[in-house]
Swiss-Prot record:
Glycosites: N316
Transmembrane segments: 495-515
Xref: CDD domains: GT1_Gtf-like
SUPFAM superfamilies in the record: UDP-Glycosyltransferase/glycogen phosphorylase
Tissue expression remark: Specifically expressed in liver and small intestine.
Name of the molecule in the record: UDP-glucuronosyltransferase 2A3
Residues in the signal sequence: 1-23
Biological classification of the source: Eukaryota, Metazoa, Chordata, Craniata, Vertebrata
Gene: UGT2A3
Record organism: Cavia porcellus
Length: 530
C-alpha cells in the first residue's frame, strides 16, 4: 500500500475510534453458505465502526473467499481435505435432499440422514482438532488479545477457541435442530405445546395430532442430538481442555445470542434477556438493475415480473422437473427472471429468461415485481418481507418447510410440493398470489412490521457485540438456570420435598387418628366392664 493511502487509512481508523470511543479486536468462527452472508454483513458494519476483524477460516471452505474481503484479516487453517472434497460432500447432500430422499420411506431416509450427519460431525471434529491443537496458531491468537469472539454455534468449536483464549463470545444463529442448542445450552424455554420444533413444518397454532407430532419430534431430536452429536463433542471438549466438561457447559457461557429472525417472521415465544432477535439484518434498499436486465423488466409493461430462485446451493434440477416448471411459467403474462444454471428446458417460454446469477434483493425491491418463487431460504424470505413481495414456496430441505409454513400462516405465501407438483399446481399458485390482493397486502403488512423497529437489526446486532467488548461480557443478563441441575431446573427436588411433607403430615394425622381411635375403643371396653 502506498504511504499516502496508508496514512489515509490510519486517519480514517482513528476518526472511527474517536467517534465510537472504542476500537476493539473481533475474532470470528464462521459457518458457510447463507450463514456467512448474515455474519459478513455484521462484520462489515463492525469494520465501519472502527473495529479490527479477524476471521478464522479453513483452507477447504467453499463460500468464504479470503482473497475478496480486504476489510477483514483472515487466519487460514490448513486441513487435510481440499475444496473439491468439500464440494463433493455438499453436492452429495443436495442430491440426497432434492432427488433421493423424497422417494424413500421415512424410516429409510431418516437412517440415511443420520449416517450423513454422523460423518459430518466427525469431519467437523477433525477441523476443530486442526484448529485448537495448532499451537502456533493458538499462541498467535492469544498474543493478539481479542476483545470478543463471534461464532455460529451450528458449527461447534468457536466457543472452545474462546474458552481456551479466555475471550467472551457472542453466538449468532437462526435455529438448531430441535432447538437443542437454544434449550440446553442457552436455557431458552421452548414448550412443545405451542413452540413448533424446527424441521417439523408446523406453526404455533397446532391441532391435537400436530401437537403429538411436535412432541415426538422434540423427543426424537433430543435423543438423536444427545446420542450422536453432543456425546462426541463432550468427549472432544473434555480432552482439549484437560478437564471433564460438556459442549453445553462451554457453549452456555455465551454472553449474547443473536437470533437471525424477528416477529415479522417468527411466532411469539418465550425468550431471555441475553437473546436478541436481529432477523433481516442483511436486507437493504434496492439498487438500480444492470441495463440489460432493467430493459427486460420494463418490457413487461403493466403485468410486471416474477423473480424465481432456488438459492445458491441448488443449481440444477432434473430435466423433467425443469420442463414442468418452465411450462407453468410460460403460461403467465408476467416476464420471469429465473436463476438457473442447468440445461435450458425445452418448454421454456418467450417470457422467461435464464440467468446464472441475479441481483435478488434489487429485483425484489423493483416496483414491477409481482411475486417471488422461492425454495424458502430465510435470507430470500427476509428480502421479500423487507420489500413486501408475496411468495410461492417450493421447500426442499432444512428449515425451508418451517419458513414457508410461517409465511402461509401469515397469509403472504402459497406453497407447492416440489416433489409431487404438476405444472397446473405451480400455475395455480402463481395466479393466486399475483391476482389475489390479500397476499400483497399481507406481505406489505409484514414489511411495515419489519421496518417499524426502534433500532435497525444491523445496528442492534453491532451494538450488542460492542456492548460485550465494552463490559467484558454481559453476565447481568445471564439467567441462573445455567447453574441448576436438570432436577433443580424442573423443581423436582422441591416437588419431592413438598410431597414428602404432605405424605409425612398425612402419615402423622393417620397415626394420631389411629391412636385416638384405639384409645377410644379401650376406654369403651373398660366402661362396659365396669
Amino acid at each position: 500500500m502506498a504511504p499516502g493511502k496508508l496514512a489515509s487509512a490510519v486517519l480514517l481508523l482513528l476518526l472511527c475510534c474517536a467517534g465510537s470511543g472504542f476500537c476493539g479486536k473481533v475474532l470470528v468462527w464462521p459457518c458457510e453458505m447463507s450463514h456467512w452472508l448474515n455474519l459478513k454483513t455484521l462484520l462489515e458494519e463492525l469494520v465501519k465502526r472502527g473495529h479490527e476483524v479477524t476471521v478464522l477460516t479453513l483452507s477447504n471452505n467453499l463460500f468464504i473467499d479470503y482473497n475478496r474481503h480486504p476489510a477483514f484479516n483472515f487466519e487460514v487453517i490448513p486441513v487435510p481435505t481440499d475444496k473439491n472434497m468439500s464440494e463433493n460432500i455438499l453436492n452429495e447432500f443436495i442430491e440426497l435432499a432434492v432427488n433421493v430422499m423424497p422417494t424413500m420411506p421415512l424410516w429409510q431416509s431418516g437412517k440415511l440422514l443420520q449416517q450423513f450427519f454422523v460423518q459430518i460431525t466427525e469431519d467437523l471434529g477433525l477441523n476443530c482438532r486442526n484448529t485448537v491443537y495448532n499451537q502456533s496458531l493458538m499462541k498467535k491468537l492469544r498474543d493478539s488479545k481479542y476483545d470478543v469472539l463471534v461464532t455460529d454455534p451450528v458449527i461447534p468449536c468457536g466457543e472452545l477457541v474462546a474458552e481456551m483464549l479466555g475471550v467472551p463470545f457472542v453466538n449468532m444463529l437462526k435455529f438448531s435442530m430441535g432447538h437443542t442448542i437454544e434449550k440446553y445450552c442457552g436455557q431458552l424455554p421452548a414448550p412443545p405445546s405451542y413452540v413448533p420444533v424446527p424441521l417439523g413444518g408446523l406453526t404455533t397454532r397446532m391441532t391435537f395430532m400436530e401437537r403429538v407430532k411436535n412432541m415426538v419430534f422434540s423427543v426424537l431430536f433430543d435423543f438423536w442430538i444427545q446420542q450422536y452429536d453432543y456425546k462426541f463433542w463432550d468427549q472432544f471438549y473434555s480432552e482439549a481442555l484437560g478437564r471433564p466438561t460438556t459442549l453445553c457447559e462451554i457453549m452456555g457461557k455465551a454472553e449474547i445470542w443473536l437470533i437471525r429472525t424477528y416477529w415479522d417472521f417468527e411466532f411469539p415465544r418465550p425468550y431471555l434477556p441475553n437473546f436478541e432477535f436481529v432477523g433481516g439484518l442483511h436486507c437493504k434498499p434496492a439498487k438500480p438493475l444492470p441495463k440489460e436486465m432493467e430493459e427486460f423488466v420494463q418490457s413487461s409493461g403493466e403485468d410486471g415480473v416474477v423473480v424465481f430462485s432456488l438459492g445458491s446451493m441448488v443449481k440444477n434440477l432434473t430435466e423433467e422437473k425443469a420442463n414442468l416448471i418452465a411450462s407453468a411459467l410460460a403460461q403467465i403474462p408476467q416476464k420471469v427472471l429465473w436463476r438457473y444454471k442447468g440445461k435450458k428446458p425445452a418448454t421454456l417460454g418467450p417470457n422467461t429468461r435464464l440467468f446464472d446469477w441475479i441481483p435478488q434483493n434489487d429485483l425484489l425491491g423493483h416496483p414491477k415485481t409481482k411475486a417471488f418463487i422461492t425454495h424458502g431460504g430465510s435470507n430470500g424470505i427476509y428480502e421479500a418481507i423487507y420489500h413486501g413481495v408475496p411468495m410461492v414456496g417450493m421447500p426442499i430441505f432444512s428449515d425451508q418447510p418451517d419458513n414457508l409454513a410461517g409465511m402461509k400462516a401469515k397469509g403472504a405465501a402459497v406453497e407447492v410440493n416440489m416433489n409431487t407438483m404438476t405444472s397446473a399446481d405451480l400455475l395455480g399458485a402463481l395466479r393466486t398470489v399475483i391476482n389475489d390482493p390479500t397476499y400483497k397486502e399481507n406481505a406489505m403488512k409484514l414489511s411495515r412490521i419489519h421496518h417499524d423497529q426502534p433500532v435497525k437489526p444491523l445496528d442492534r446486532a453491532a451494538f450488542w457485540v460492542e456492548f460485550v467488548m465494552h463490559h467484558k461480557g454481559a453476565k447481568h443478563l445471564r439467567v441462573a438456570a445455567h447453574d441448576l441441575s436438570w432436577f433443580q431446573y424442573h423443581s423436582l427436588d422441591v416437588i419431592g420435598f413438598l410431597l414428602a411433607c404432605v405424605a409425612s403430615a398425612i402419615l402423622l394425622v393417620t397415626k394420631c387418628c389411629l391412636f385416638s381411635f384405639q384409645n377410644f375403643i379401650k376406654i369403651g371396653k373398660r366402661i362396659k366392664k365396669e
